[in-house]
Regions:
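Conserved short beta-strand elements that form part of the metal-binding/catalytic scaffold
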Residues: 32-64, 108-114
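Short amphipathic alpha-helices within nucleic acid-binding modules
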Residues: 24, 74-79
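Vicinal oxygen chelate
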Residues: 1-4, 10, 78-116
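Amphipathic alpha-helical segments
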Residues: 17-32
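Conserved hydrophobic/aromatic beta-strand scaffold that supports enzyme active sites
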Residues: 42, 67, 98-100
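Helix N-cap motif at beta-to-alpha junctions
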Residues: 17-18, 71-73
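N-terminal beta-strand motif that seeds the catalytic metal site of vicinal oxygen chelate
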Residues: 1-20, 49, 64-66, 115
Length: 116
C-alpha cells in the first residue's frame, strides 16, 4: 500500500529528571514545549514532536538515534560548547556535516547539515 507512512510523528527520549530535562531542552536547545503532563513533555521540532518521558531505568544508546537538522552547524556547535555541553568535534564528510553531543542523561544526540 503506497503512502502508508506520511512522516515520523514523535520521537521519545527517556530522562531521569523531567523538570531538569525540560529546562535543558528549552534553554540550551531552544525548543518550544507543546505540553507537559503525566510524566511526559513534548517539544516541537518541525513536524516531529520530541517527547521526553520520565523514567527510572535510563539506558543510553551507543550512537545517536536521530539528528537535529540545522543550516548553521558551526554556530550550533559553538553555542553548545559555550553552554558546557559535552560535544564531539564537527566532522565534514563532504555531502554531510555532523557532530554528536550529550544531553543531561548522557544520551548521544546529533546535529547534521547538508544541502537539501
Amino acid at each position: 500500500m503506497k503512502g502508508l507512512v506520511n512522516r515520523i510523528d514523535t520521537v521519545f527520549v527517556e530522562v531521569s529528571n523531567l523538570d531538569l530535562s525540560i529546562k535543558w531542552y528549552s534553554e540550551v536547545l531552544g525548543l518550544t514545549m507543546r505540553w507537559n503532563r503525566n510524566g511526559y513533555a513534548a517539544f516541537s521540532v518541525g513536524e516531529t514532536a520530541l517527547t521526553l518521558v520520565q523514567a527510572t531505568d535510563i539506558t543510553s544508546a551507543r550512537h545517536s538515534p536521530f539528528n537535529f537538522f540545522t543550516t548553521n552547524i558551526y554556530e550550533v556547535h559553538k553555542m553548545l560548547v559555550e553552554n558546557n555541553v559535552e560535544t564531539e568535534d564537527v566532522v565534514d564528510y563532504g555531502d554531510i556535516i555532523t557532530f554528536d553531543f550529550k544531553d543531561p542523561d548522557g544520551h548521544i544526540l546529533g546535529f547534521c547539515q547538508f544541502e537539501a
